[in-house]
From Swiss-Prot:
Keywords: Cleavage on pair of basic residues, Membrane, Signal, Transmembrane, Transmembrane helix. It comes from Apis mellifera. It is a single-pass type I membrane protein. It is found in: Membrane. This is Prohormone-3. The chain crosses the membrane at residues 90-112. One of its GO terms (cellular component) is membrane. Residues 1-19 form the signal peptide. Disulfide bonds: none annotated.
Length: 314
C-alpha cells in the first residue's frame, strides 16, 4: 500500500509540472495582436506592457495615466484567465488519478495466488475441475511455488532408501535392518540374516532356510516368502527330475514307445540311475500307488520274506 501511495504522489507531481509547462507554451504561442483576431487572449505576454485596451493614439496621448491603468488591468485579467484555466485542468487530472488509485486498492492480498475467488479450473492438476487427469500446459496459477512466495519445496530432504543407508547406530536404520560398521566410524544399514516370513529382504541369502526373497504383489518391496512350487505329477512332460513330485516317488525319465517320438515324462522309478538328474530318495514320503495301466513288478524280496516266515514251521 505504501508503494502505491508513493507512486501516486510522484505521478501527481509530474502532472502538475506538465500542466504548468503546457499553460506557458499555450500563452507564448505567436498570435496576431488585439484588434485583428477579435479577443485579447491572442496577445503575447511581451506585448502586454506596450499595448492599451480601449484607447486610440490621441486619447492615449491626452490621458497617459489612464492608459497605464488600463494596460495593467488588462494584463491582470489576461493572466488570471489562463491561471484559472490551468487550475481547472490540473484539478480534473488529479481527480482522475485519485479515482484510478482508489480502484486499484480493492484487490485482496493472499499467499500463493493472485485471485480473490476460488475457481476449480485453476486447480485441475489436483483433481478438481472438469478436466480430471488431463495434463495440459501449466498456466500462471499452476506453476510451482518459488522463493518469491515465501515457501519452497527445495528445502525438503530427499528420501534415502533403507538399504545401504549411512548410520552409526541401529536406530538410524529401518525396522528389520541393522547398522554394520566394517571400516571407519560410519556404517551402512543391511538386512538381518535369517529373516522370517513376511520380513523385508534383498537377496535369498537374507531369508531363513526354505524361504526365498520375492516381490510383494502390488508394491516394489521384497519380502521373505515360501517358494511356490508346482511339482509335476505322473506322465507330465519334464526336463529334469527336480520338476517331478519326488514325495510321490516320481522322477523324470526318457520314455520310448513303439512308433512314437521319445519324450521325457515324470514316472515312478525303482533305480535312481534311470532318472534324469539327481534324485533324493530320502524325500519319498508316500507309498507308491500303481495305476491300472502300469505293469506291476513283483519284488523278489517279498517272496523271500514269505519263505523266511514259513521256514520255522516247516
Amino acid at each position: 500500500m505504501g508503494r502505491v501511495l508513493l507512486s501516486a504522489s510522484s505521478l501527481l507531481l509530474h502532472i502538475q509540472v506538465f500542466t504548468r509547462r503546457l499553460g506557458n507554451e499555450y500563452i507564448e504561442q505567436d498570435r496576431p495582436p488585439c484588434g485583428t483576431s477579435g479577443h485579447p487572449g491572442s496577445i503575447r505576454p511581451t506585448e502586454m506592457k506596450t499595448m492599451t485596451f480601449g484607447l486610440n493614439d490621441e486619447e492615449r496621448a491626452k490621458h497617459p495615466r489612464e492608459s497605464e491603468v488600463l494596460n495593467e488591468n488588462g494584463a491582470a485579467r489576461f493572466q488570471q484567465r489562463y491561471t484559472h484555466m490551468g487550475q481547472k485542468m490540473y484539478t480534473c487530472v488529479a481527480l482522475t488519478v485519485v479515482a484510478l488509485v482508489s480502484t486499484m486498492h480493492f484487490g485482496v492480498e493472499a499467499w500463493g495466488g493472485l485471485f480473490n475467488r476460488f475457481s476449480p479450473e485453476m486447480l485441475s492438476n489436483l483433481g478438481y475441475g472438469s478436466h480430471g487427469d488431463h495434463i495440459s500446459k501449466s498456466g500462471l496459477y499452476q506453476r510451482p511455488l518459488s522463493t518469491s512466495y515465501g515457501y519452497s519445496y527445495d528445502s525438503l530432504e530427499e528420501v534415502i532408501p533403507c538399504y545401504e543407508r549411512k548410520c552409526t547406530l541401529n536406530e538410524h536404520c529401518c525396522p528389520g535392518s541393522i547398522c554394520m560398521n566394517v571400516d571407519g566410524d560410519v556404517g551402512h544399514c543391511v538386512f538381518e540374516l535369517g529373516q522370517k516370513q513376511g520380513e523385508l529382504c534383498r537377496n535369498d541369502n537374507d531369508c531363513e532356510t526354505g524361504l526365498m526373497c520375492a516381490e510383494v504383489a502390488g508394491s516394489e518391496t521384497r519380502s521373505c516368502q515360501v517358494p511356490i512350487t508346482s511339482n509335476k505329477l505322473y506322465n507330465e512332460e519334464c526336463n529334469v527330475s527336480g520338476e517331478c513330485d519326488i514325495s510321490r516317488g516320481l522322477c523324470c525319465q526318457l520314455q520310448r514307445r513303439h512308433r512314437q517320438t521319445p519324450r521325457k515324462v515324470c514316472s515312478y522309478f525303482k533305480d535312481p540311475l534311470v532318472c534324469i538328474g539327481p534324485v533324493a530318495t530320502d524325500q519319498i514320503k508316500s507309498i507308491v500307488q500303481y495305476t491300472s495301466g502300469e505293469k506291476r513288478i513283483t519284488g523278489q524280496g517279498n517272496r523271500i520274506f514269505k519263505r523266511s516266515l514259513k521256514a520255522p514251521f516247516a
